[in-house]
Amino acid sequence: MGQSLFNLLYYVIMQNTILIFGYGYTGSYVAKLLSQKGWKFIGTSSSSSLTTETIIIIPYDREAITNVIKLATHILISIPPDENGDIVVGNFVDLLFLAKNLKWIGYLSSTAVYGNHDGALVSEESALRPSNERAKQRIRAEAQWLEFGKQHKISVNIFRLAGIYGPKRNALEQLRNGKAKSIFKAGHVFSRIHVEDIARVIVAAIKLGSVREIYNLADDKPCPTFEVNNLAAELLGVIPPPIVHIKDAELSEMATEFYNDNKRISNYKIKDKLHIALKYPTFREGLKAIYDWNYGDSI
């Protein structure tokens, strides 16, 4: 682990400590916000170089997790499920009983669980119509965590994320790397959300501490991908990628599945229950901010 268990205990004792299964892009933004409030972090990752003053990285294995699980007051799961559902439940559910101070569990799911609603507005109460196996796996994982929370009287929050974008993962990068595709399908839209707003919602949910909640995380403007690409091209001062009709597009299996589903994700609940005012209410504010931070002085 890079340091003794004694030092690890000293590091986290008497503090709110969140164990992030699958510490990566989204988890790093959650850590940034909570570290400002004095929280400590333990994350699983294959890259020990991610260890900093505020987060200790451990491998995703039984011995390492056994050593730290009892220190966790909160757990966030950011690992995709497999055919059996959530892999943390599958591999380590017995270890969760060692976490005597555990108050809250958050699971990062996906709006893919809703499947196709023919462009209709979808809330947390809408029917789940999974159209592919990955979405079905997400539903199984959600159910496993909600049942665990119910049985053991622990707060469990499910976060159904729309398409994630932010620094290093956005249409500007895709254009610069020649990977942007503008596909047209009549009436089809995607919902998305900036990673900073995801972190802000998660922190607000932790603060509220509701026993059993499901939240949609999306911004205010579902739209076709080509609208996002057009703005990115405008900011970069380049020609936008040509718009290709869906019937003429060469798409991967995963991309085809995305275009088979059409829905507009409602974010009313995070505004009403968590009092969230999105920092980036649409892709326009988000992309412009990313451009100003990362590209404005170099192009």
Give residue ranges: language-model regions:
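Glycine/proline-rich active-site loop of Rossmann-fold NAD(P)-dependent oxidoreductases
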Residues: I139, H152-I154, I164-R176, I183, ...
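Conserved Rossmann-fold NAD(P)-dependent oxidoreductase catalytic core, especially the SDR/UDP-sugar
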Residues: V93-E133
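Catalytic helix-loop patch of NAD(P)-dependent Rossmann-fold dehydrogenases
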Residues: D118-I158
